[in-house]
Amino acid sequence: MRSLTLAALLLCSLLLVFHTSAAEELQAQEGHLMIPGDTDTALETVDDERLFECTFECDIKKEGKPCKPKGCKCDDKDNKDHKKCSGGWRCKLKLCLKI
């Protein structure tokens, strides 16, 4: 019983740390305004909530289009497909993350 409680406590702590770091990253991104003449024109503007959702669910669609580029797969063991990711998407821990 104690080990189950300890495991649950550790899991909650880990989720809190991850959520806090993700929230700080999103807050930092809010200050960055995209100008049409920027070099980031290939990036599709995604609102903060969708960006957070797309970090965990690579197949979520926004306005009928996938959030991540076509061909960006992170489920391979060696992450060899990370070179196919573009537009700010990278493979981290077998997840497609928007950087």
Swiss-Prot record:
Disulfide pattern: 54-67, 58-91, 72-74, 85-96
Maturation propeptide residues: 24-50
Gene Ontology annotations for the cellular component aspect, listed alphabetically: extracellular region
Signal peptide region: 1-23
Pfam families: Toxin_20
Listed InterPro entries: Hwtx-2-like (IPR012625)
A GO MF label: toxin activity
Location in the cell: Secreted
Tissue specificity statement from the Swiss-Prot or TrEMBL entry: Expressed by the venom gland.
Record keywords, A-Z: Disulfide bond, Secreted, Signal, Toxin
Recorded family membership: Belongs to the neurotoxin 12 (Hwtx-2) family. 04 (lasiotoxin) subfamily.
Functional summary from the UniProt entry: Toxin that causes irreversible contractile paralysis into adult Aedes aegypti resulting in 100% mortality after 24 hours.
Name of protein: U1-theraphotoxin-Lsp1b
UniProt source species: Lasiodora sp. (strain IBSP 8539)
